[in-house]
C-alpha cells in the first residue's frame, strides 16, 4: 500500500466505486449518496487522529460514522486505497485489521478478532480481495491477494492468494483456476461465490 495524499486517496476511493458498481453514474452521486464511501472517507480522518494520539476524538468520529452510515470501522484499522463497501449496513472492521488496495466488502461483513487477546488479533486482507455479504473473517491471519470469500462464510484460518472460500467453517473450493472439491461437496451443488457476487448489485 503506497502512501498517497489525502486528495489522491479520495479520488481513488471514488473511482473504485464508479469502476465496480454499475449503478453509480457520477462522482457527485458517489460523494452524496454512497454510505460506504462516506464511511471510508470519515475513517481516514479518524485514523489520522488515532495515529496522532487524539484517540478519544478519533473514537468519537468513528461512532458518529456508525450512526450516520451503519458501518463500524475502528480508527486503528489500516485501510489501503480503493476500498469499496457496497450497501454497507452492518459492516464491522476491528482495530488491528489491515486492508490492502482495491478490496470489496459487501453488507454485513465482519473483520473481527477472537477472544480478548491484546496485540494483533484481527485479519489482514490482501489486495483485490472480495468478501461476500454476511461473511465473517475472524482472527489474526491473512486472506491472500486476489482471493474471494463467499456470502455467509465464516473464515477462521489463513487463505492463500487467488483462492475461493465458501461455507461454515470456510473451505477452499478453488485455487486459481483449479476447482478443489472436498468429500462433502459435489460438482452439482458446489456454490460459485464469484458468479453470485457479480449479480449482487441492484
Regions found by a protein language model. Give the residues of each.
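Conserved beta-strand-loop-alpha-helix hinge in the C-terminal portion
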Residues: 163, 168-183
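Short phosphate-engaging motifs
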Residues: 41, 155, 172
